[in-house]
Amino acid sequence: MMEGLKKRTRKAFGIRKKEKDTDSTGSPDRDGMQPSPHEPPYHSKAECAREGGKKASKKSNGAPNGFYAEIDWERYNSPELDEEGYSIRPEEPGSTKGKHFYSSSESEEEEESHKKFNIKIKPLQSKDVLKNAATVDELKASIGNIALSPSPVRKSPRRSPGAIKRNLSSEEVARPRRSTPTPELTSKKPLDDTLALAPLFGPPLESAFDEQKTEVLLDQPEIWGSGQPMNPSTESPELARPFPTGTPPPLPPKTVPATPPRTGSPLTVATGNDQAATEAKIEKLPSISDLDSIFGPVLSPKSVAVNTEEKWVHFSDASPEHVTPELTPREQVVTPPAASDIPADSPAPAPPGPTGSAGPPGPPGPRHVPSPLNLEEVQKKVAEQTFIKDDYLETLSSPKECGLGQRATPPPPPPPTYRTVVSSPGPGSGSGTGTTSGASSPARPATPLVPCSTTPPPPPPRPPSRPKLPPGKPGVGDVSRPFSPPIHSSSPPPIAPLARAESTSSISSTNSLSAATTPTVGSSRGPSPLTMGAQDTLPVAAAFTETVNAYFKGADPSKCIVKITGEMVLSFPAGITRHFANNPSPAALTFRVVNSSRLEHVLPNPQLLCCDNTQNDANTKEFWVNMPNLMTHLKKVSEQKPQATYYNVDMLKYQVSAQGIQSTPLNLAVNWRCEPASTDLRIDYKYNTDAMSTAVALNNVQFLVPIDGGVTKLQAVLPPAVWNAEQQRILWKIPDISQKSENGGVGSLLARFQLSEGPSKPSPLVVQFTSEGSTLSGCDIELVGAGYRFSLIKKRFAAGKYLADN
């Protein structure tokens, strides 16, 4: 309780009365604080705290002497002062107890009658409220003195006690000082104030995390799906969100173990992941069955062998007779709407055998359709032999073409067979336009069975929405050529059932090991990114993917056997179907393949492509798309996959002429020295820039060699490698090999194995690698005419069956 607050001019600190009892007064500058005449004596701290409920150690007001304006009561709550500025214990009016803190009694009595007035200040606290049954307003006034962190929710203003002036009467001081009441505090006690504020500080953070978790749950498949190369084949609707947790979805098992090398140490058993990964890798490598005639029998008995036949067609060759085989159950299966769409630059698991990799042309006749493949074997092969994937949305970055968040969940494991998922029925058994082959796209015939008419009908008239051709560019009708292959009147227009147009990935190498190391971007569950007007050009993406198969025998370059196959895929945005619906007569899509002199066999899609066999330029081949068939096919796919974003369409398959070892991007030579107690292995490799149209690095290079003879210990392994004791295989991994590598991409791998059941028998070395940004054939593509534009042209190649023997 504070009373008798005096209103007087304070004297200078240094002036003191000589008769003052220095033993009974507190030091003004005690506790190391700045000297202040407003500090109460040390021995009065407990009493002041008990009476006023404030801190015993008062803070200086900081105002000069003679300042009578508003006082910051948070810093200064002074009892009465004497002439020299020393604190005096406040007394009740008329009190005779003499509690004057030993200050000058003469000075007090002189000024008390005419200078001193009484102010009754009662800072209300919890005990006072409970004892005196204080009103709500008094409770607010007392709580207002408590310094709390500002509430993030409640915005009630808090009036500072400093607004109380020293010349106010006790009536005015007792009146509540808040200008705005706080209804939230009316039912709370001061003791519960902290609890009442708990929801203001805690739950908002929790709710924010809850909202964030909810958002992550919804968006994470889109976030992690953009970089997640799961087993690419299909995407079932029930597995659209396979990873609902806050952690990123796990990558599929990589093809090589990641354990540290075990060189110079006793033989130990590798971990389960290493064993499974290495086993999967060695099983899938020798899986191109149609190359058995070149590379010999398949090395692994567990590999999937598919007998396929192919008919490579020269442009100069006459079209074979129409063959109308019976549709097998494989062909009759309609593509289920369970696959997500990946752009053209994203690869897909090709059917067994490299795309378009087949023997020389054979006589026309009925074809043998392979029976369905074993489920377990195909799942393993397709899941682990897909080629590296890339993104397509990066190219559709304009606001017209692409929206944010166009990402999708990683696809689930593949179906029983690739064909049963991606196949769709042909135009009709009587049309004579459909057959199948294991090495070509399962959704279309292996060979063009419908000849291009030599007397073509004129192209359709230019639609009013199509912009005029720029000067110097030939129109579609400038050259006499058919717009589409002739269609028998007894059959409906072909649907062009190109399977991988709606599969999760459409560019593949059947023997690549890099699917687990490269993210996939581009699939989406959202709407089509294509938003365009009638005068805009349609974005189209193209991708060349080539597979090199090679067999090296010892160090003799003349014994190297090489085969290179490739495919070209076009990718269309899903919104193109709406554009075609609004423009039923779109511009014909015409393109030419340039630098095609090295292409020995070119197999265009007979359902969608027309070619001019009379072209004289051997370095250029021109094609144009059967637009009615393309529109029909894309419409069908859009109905089956309304959430798809991209439609990938196989357009060309081809074979590249090879010049032996000079056509291999990585030359190999293996040397074995087998003894009863040990085996020495040396692998020499050389990066060959001459094999590529543009020198690019070989990525994720892996060397895998099985070693028999009961290996008990590894010695002198350079560089470090991973040994799988259960499968008796050693694996080297090199991130990349290029001209910038050590020694210009030339190096050796060395290893010595201690044997218990020697000698070892030399086994073939299996090599895998991928490369982006170049092709081995040097082919390129360019558009002819207007109405379309290339948003992306992707080029890549990878090792297929890449072997080296002693």
From Swiss-Prot:
GO molecular function terms here?
microtubule binding; phospholipid binding; SH3 domain binding; tubulin binding
Skewed-composition ranges (Polar residues):
265-276
Region Necessary and sufficient to mediate interaction with CANX: what ranges? 627-806
Annotated region (Interaction with DPF motifs-containing proteins), positions in chain: 539-545, 571-573, 645-648, 791-796
The Phosphothreonine modification is found at: T180, T182, T247, T259, T324, T328, T335, T409
Task: Output the superkingdom of the source species.
Answer: Eukaryota
Q: Which SUPFAM superfamilies match?
A: Second domain of Mu2 adaptin subunit (ap50) of ap2 adaptor (SSF49447)
Compositional bias segments (type: Pro residues): 245-260, 346-369, 454-473
Query: What causes induction of this gene?
Result: Up-regulated in the hypothalamus of obese mice.
GO-annotated biological processes: clathrin-dependent endocytosis; energy homeostasis; plasma membrane tubulation; positive regulation of feeding behavior; positive regulation of receptor-mediated endocytosis; response to dietary excess; synaptic vesicle endocytosis
Protein location: Membrane, Clathrin-coated pit
Q: State what this protein does.
A: May function in clathrin-mediated endocytosis. Has both a membrane binding/tubulating activity and the ability to recruit proteins essential to the formation of functional clathrin-coated pits. Has a preference for membranes enriched in phosphatidylserine and phosphoinositides and is required for the endocytosis of the transferrin receptor. May also bind tubulin. May play a role in the regulation of energy homeostasis.
The subunit structure is:
Interacts with proteins essential or regulating the formation of functional clathrin-coated pits. Interacts with CANX. Interacts with AP2A1. Interacts with EPS15. Interacts with SH3GL3. Interacts with AMPH. Interacts with ITSN1 (via SH3 domains). Interacts with and REPS1.
Which PANTHER family does the record cross-reference, listed alphabetically? F-BAR DOMAIN ONLY PROTEIN 2 (PTHR23065:SF8), PROLINE-SERINE-THREONINE PHOSPHATASE INTERACTING PROTEIN 1 (PTHR23065)
Q: What is this protein called?
A: SH3-containing GRB2-like protein 3-interacting protein 1
Provide the species name: Mus musculus (Mouse)
Its lineage opens with: Eukaryota, Metazoa, Chordata, Craniata, Vertebrata
